[in-house]
């Protein structure tokens, strides 16, 4: 049992289990997957640009193979977007929590948390002890100066 588990189970379940909006879930899941959301969303820009260019080109009566290539490019960008970004939306949008074991429930029942015990303050050396060390250094420096003469 780790400290994190004890802390998670000590918090009321209502506070932990909350629904995230799709945007929050997208941000969290993109962070988990190592996908920067801005870069992933920027992939939609060329997709829309290709569709826009395709519609403009079509209105001018350009040959069909140009329109076909344009549509293929736009579809390619759309597929790349779907494969890279859409899984972020499909991940869990509610935090999953494992149920606490018997030991953890027994610990939490009494409000006893191992990490909350009082820790004695660190013992610092007294001023006299610190000065003794300084005096020894001063004496050794005096001896060195006398010996060097």
Curated annotation (Swiss-Prot):
Bias kind Acidic residues: ranges: 127-142
Subcellular location(s) per record: Membrane
Coiled coil (UniProt feature): none
Topology class, membrane: Multi-pass membrane protein
Superkingdom: Eukaryota
Residues modified to Phosphoserine: 21
Transmembrane segments: 48-68, 72-92
Residue ranges, annotated region (Disordered): 116-149
Keywords annotated in UniProt: Membrane, Phosphoprotein, Transmembrane, Transmembrane helix
GO cellular component: membrane
Name of the protein described by the UniProt record: Uncharacterized membrane protein C622.01c
Organism of provenance: Schizosaccharomyces pombe (strain 972 / ATCC 24843) (Fission yeast)
